[in-house]
């Protein structure tokens, strides 16, 4: 969710830069340098575990209280445990 919000804000920022550059009549936009500095937003977020229904290969890929279901495709499902 956090990543999708950041990507949406980045896309809106790029659209704003492009429209403002067109309004100024500028042939040289400085947006490519700005986009390179924002590259980290577009990289996938590394997680320490997979959430419910996330893809997995083994139980340790899934978050706490989840286990890897071996049905094809493999996914993380609740392992019927509770607690903190």
From Swiss-Prot:
User: Which subcellular locations apply to this protein?
Assistant: Secreted
Its function, per the record, reads: Probable ion channel inhibitor.
The entry sums up its family as follows: Belongs to the neurotoxin 10 (Hwtx-1) family. 05 (F4a) subfamily.
Looking up InterPro entries in the UniProt record yields: Huwentoxin-1 (IPR011696)
Give the main location. Answer: secreted
GO cellular component terms, semicolon-separated: extracellular region
Listed A to Z, the keywords are: Amidation, Disulfide bond, Ion channel impairing toxin, Knottin, Secreted, Signal, Toxin
Q: What molecular functions are annotated in GO for this chain?
A: ion channel inhibitor activity; toxin activity
Q: Which residues form the signal peptide?
A: 1-21
Instruction: Quote the tissue specificity entry.
Output: Expressed by the venom gland.
Q: What is known of its domains?
A: The presence of a 'disulfide through disulfide knot' structurally defines this protein as a knottin.
Disulphide bond pairs: 49-63, 56-68, 62-76
The chain residues annotated with the modification Valine amide are: 82
Q: Check the record and name the Pfam families matching this protein.
A: Toxin_12
- The protein's name: U21-theraphotoxin-Cg1a 1
The residues of the propeptide are 22-47
* Taxonomic source organism: Chilobrachys guangxiensis
